[in-house]
A protein has these predicted regions:
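N-terminal hydrophobic/helix-forming segments and targeting peptides
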Residues: 1-369
Length: 369
């Protein structure tokens, strides 16, 4: 009787993902994004990021100025005085914290600035102020926590920022999560990619030449009520506006693929997300069409953001003066408003590519009714 011999099956080994080296321009954009991400610039105290952006745009624009609110404007004039005025914006500020009490032994009370989930605060390292004083959000270790407390979310008003005995921290100082920027190959990880990614994209847009009067506005205080955008939109008097921001990606590790999220549908690697409408804006249909047709003609991947929650500076800009046709384009990002967000490098590059192409092909037909 013949005996059967077992044949060993070879285990399949995963092929390494090929990462295309960035071009020189892309490498410059990533380096700028790193600087922007690692700066401390919480709403109302955007000076550190504004300084970086100003240095980056001074040689790219015909005019650079800062208004009383702190908005930074960089203007590229068109050849014709009759050219349409197009406002393109990204916000400088990030969510974070404000020190509100000068405590003893380096322990300071603090409040959230912008939308932050209390669940993610415990034990997180922070940077305080432009000097990035190192601290940590203190909490009771598990040894001291009662069993019935372990399933309870600790509220922010019972936490402290601990900076040791450093006396240079004072009430009013801003703080952010202490997250270094990291290149992950196909993606990047960092804090405040909402909306430092948009700021880096807008700097890249300023490198182009367009048949429009381009008004680039780097706005302040978006995370606390679109306050800078209200002023910027009024000052610019644009014929149209494009807002560049970040939107929550829904392709999360904990998300059931079979469940449709009622507010967000974007995915990393699928291109910039064009808004139809959100909580604050119904995007102008003509601008949606122009962006989508531009993407298709230039073979730039894009996605339509599912109508629903959230909002951008467009919510304030479209209501200024007699009204401004507006649309938002966002870079999708995972884990926004947390210590570390994740963003596809291709989505980042393609957002700049799409808006540049849309501006280059601008004509009177874009806003024709």
């Amino acid at each position: 009787m013949a005996t059967k011999t077992k044949t060993k099956t070879k285990k399949k080994t995963a092929r390494p993902i090929k990462v295309t080296p960035p071009t020189a321009a892309q490498a410059d954009s990533l380096e700028l994004l790193k600087q922007l991400s690692e700066a401390v610039a919480v709403s109302g105290d955007e000076g550190a990021v504004r300084k970086i952006v100003r240095e980056a745009v001074t040689h790219l624009a015909d005019e650079v100025s800062v208004d009383a609110m702190g908005n930074l404007f960089a203007i590229k004039h068109a050849a014709s005085s009759r050219a349409p005025r197009v406002l393109v914006t990204a916000h400088l500020d990030e969510i974070g914290f404000m020190i509100v009490g000068e405590g003893k032994d380096g322990l300071h009370s603090f409040e959230a600035v912008g939308g932050i989930d209390d669940r993610i605060l415990l034990g997180k390292p922070v940077w305080v102020g432009e000097d990035k004083i190192k601290g940590v959000i203190g909490f009771k270790p598990i040894h001291l926590v009662k069993p019935n407390e372990r399933s309870t979310v600790v509220k922010i008003d019972s936490l402290k920022v601990d900076v040791g005995a450093n006396r240079t921290v004072k009430a009013g100082d801003r703080a952010t999560f202490a997250t270094p920027f990291v290149d992950l190959g196909l993606a990047v990880r960092g804090k405040a990619l909402d909306d430092r990614a948009g700021c880096a994209v807008l700097v890249e847009i300023l490198r182009g030449k367009y048949p429009v009067e381009l008004i680039a506005a780097f706005t302040v205080q978006e995370e606390v009520g679109l306050r800078g955008a209200k002023v910027a939109g009024y000052t610019a008097e644009p014929d149209a506006a494009i807002v560049i921001d970040c939107t929550p990606a829904n392709d999360l590790p904990s998300q059931d693929d079979d469940v449709e999220n009622s507010h967000y549908n974007t995915k990393l690697g699928h291109g910039p997300a064009i808004y139809s409408f959100d909580r604050g804006t119904v995007s102008d249909k003509r601008l949606i069409k122009h962006l989508a047709s531009t993407a298709e003609s230039k073979r730039i991947p894009y996605q339509h953001r599912q109508p629903g929650g959230g909002g951008t500076d467009a919510g304030a800009i479209h209501l200024t003066r007699s009204g401004v046709p507006s649309v938002s384009v966002s870079v999708p990002g995972r884990y926004l408003h947390s210590p570390a967000a994740l963003m596809s490098k291709d989505d980042f590059y393609n957002t700049a590519k799409l808006v540049r192409a849309a501006l280059e092909s601008w004509s009177p037909k874009v806003l024709k009714r």
